A protein has these predicted regions:
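Conserved donor-binding/catalytic core segment of Leloir-type glycosyltransferases
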Residues: 204-220, 226-229
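Conserved acidic donor-binding segment of nucleotide-sugar-dependent glycosyltransferases
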Residues: 324-335, 343-349
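Short alpha-helical donor nucleotide-sugar binding micro-motif in glycosyltransferases
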Residues: 81, 269-272, 279-284
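Short hydrophobic beta-strand element within catalytic cores of glycosyltransferases
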Residues: 309-312
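A charged, aromatic-enriched C-terminal amphipathic alpha-helix characteristic of glycosyltransferases
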Residues: 31, 349-402
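Aromatic "clamp/platform" in nucleotide-sugar-dependent glycosyltransferases that forms part
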Residues: 292
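Donor nucleotide-sugar binding/catalytic pocket of nucleotide-sugar-dependent glycosyltransferases
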Residues: 39, 54-57, 135, 140-193
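N-terminal subdomain of nucleotide-sugar transferases
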Residues: 1-45, 49-55, 373, 397, ...
Length: 444
């Protein structure tokens, strides 16, 4: 199959969405499919470095300058998609490149599926201080984008429930993003490497190491872990929290740790190299997160792949993932966080090898790729079925034949409408030069 992935974010940008798309591309290619990524330009890579990655002219997005939006390229995208003979388009964003993907699919008359990655209610406050888009507007924007598509992939039951609440009627399927197991099941990581890292972090052999690994922003809710950490230390002083990552909330967390007088028990490492992340997971006794904004969260599966159980704020996605005490401990109220940590330390059993192996396949990139392709096939079969119904033969003079003639009459454009369209075209031609150039640039 020839597939086009349309996304605003892609490697080398760092995000869960970019990682998910790259993983999907690689897994589909392993199955023998042709996959082309239509995305934004990036200063860190050459525009024409890879013929399977089509980078469209873009500018930084307001309020999120590390993210970009396209401002031109519709016609060129259409020509490339037509040349590559795409059979299906898979959009990964509801904005610039996603809208472009819908237009290209409509022009080529091929199906479009979408993955809904982000709960925008948690992020609209960052766009023009929340003055441009209100949380109550999100469902209408999402509904407008999705309702004429052929299917939507939900990374978790959280997203499925959300889209049901939005009254999205198109076919939906829950397919969590998989991870590359080989990145975490590494034979080159020795016990000596693990012990050495714990020493470097100041974690003693008899101490429990809790690992927080993410972009450090307020919605990750690391502040909740810090706020309840004194309660944990009162009951069990041999616990240390290691915070890996960087972001806009980093300094605030360091100030909070100082105010709570827990500086000696909290280690801030900043960003670490991607190849070292697996060592941190293996060195930790537990991975911890109090975030309530994740639709899935790849760090949970990365931790489980490394054999490290999770302590996290429960949600439908984690209810499915953490289905055995050996995989982790969930809490559902922030005030229960400290008790959850203490319970996990005291009660978590050793991972059963067979159950862990079964879990590894369900969270693997291979399983993810096969599940997405199966959804593509269902969409294509459904699309062919619709076309057969639409173009089925009818008996001349029958009710069906008369209905078709009536439909043809109804969709014939009246001459008055043609005249009105012509007048509109004249007005467009007379539009200001800079406006015409903007339209032309986007189309080219």
């Amino acid at each position: 199959m020839r597939i086009g992935l349309f996304t605003d974010t892609y490697f080398p940008q760092v995000s869960g969405v970019a990682t998910s798309i790259r993983t999907l591309k690689e897994e589909l290619e392993k199955q023998g499919h042709e996959v082309y990524v239509f995305t934004t330009t990036d200063k860190k890579v050459k525009r024409y470095e890879d013929p399977t990655i089509i980078r469209l002219p873009s500018v930084p997005f307001i309020s999120f300058t590390d993210r970009r939006v396209v401002y031109r390229g519709l016609i060129s995208s259409y020509k490339i998609a037509k040349q590559y003979k795409l059979e299906l388009i898979h959009t990964q964003t509801e904005f610039s490149v996603g809208l472009l993907g819908k237009m290209v699919a409509a022009a080529l008359r091929i199906p479009v599926v979408h993955t809904y990655h982000t709960q925008y209610e948690d992020y609209v406050e960052y766009i023009a201080n929340g003055k441009l888009i209100k949380p109550s507007m999100v469902k209408y924007i999402v509904r407008g984008f999705l309702n004429d598509l052929d299917g939507v992939i939900c990374p978790s039951r959280i997203v499925l429930n959300l889209l049901d609440d939005y009254h999205i009627k198109i076919p939906k399927r829950v397919i969590p993003t998989g991870i590359k197991l080989e990145d975490y099941l590494r034979d080159d990581i020795s016990q000596k490497d693990i012990d050495s890292l714990r020493v470097d972090l100041g974690v003693a052999n008899d101490e429990t190491m809790l690992l927080s690994l993410s972009r450090i922003s307020s919605e990750k809710n690391i502040q909740a872990v810090l706020s309840h950490f004194p309660e944990v230390l009162t009951e069990n002083p041999k616990v240390k929290l290691v915070v890996v990552g960087d972001g806009p909330y980093s300094d605030d967390l360091k100030v909070l740790a100082k105010e709570l007088d827990i500086e000696s028990k909290v280690v801030f490492t900043g960003m670490v190299n991607h190849e070292d992340v697996a060592v941190y997971y293996r060195a930790a006794d537990f991975f911890i997160s109090a975030s309530t904004s994740e639709t899935q969260g790849l760090t949970y599966t990365e931790s489980l792949a490394s054999g490290t159980p999770v302590i996290a704020h429960g949600n439908p996605y984690l209810d499915d993932l953490i289905d055995d005490k050996m995989f982790g401990t969930l809490f559902y109220r922030e005030e229960d966080l400290a008790d959850a940590i203490l319970d996990a330390i005291a009660e978590t059993p050793v991972m059963d090898a067979k159950k862990h192996q079964e879990k590894l396949y369900t969270i693997s990139a291979e399983h993810f790729g096969k599940s997405v392709y199966a959804f593509y096939l269902d969409v294509l079969i459904s699309e062919k079925s619709k076309k057969k119904e639409k173009f089925s033969l009818t008996v001349k003079g029958s009710k069906t034949d008369r209905s078709i003639k009536l439909a043809k009459t109804a969709i014939s454009l009246p001459s008055q409408a043609v005249k009105a369209t012509a007048m509109t075209s004249v007005k467009v031609v007379k539009a200001p030069k800079h406006l015409i150039e903007i339209v032309r640039d986007f189309l080219d």
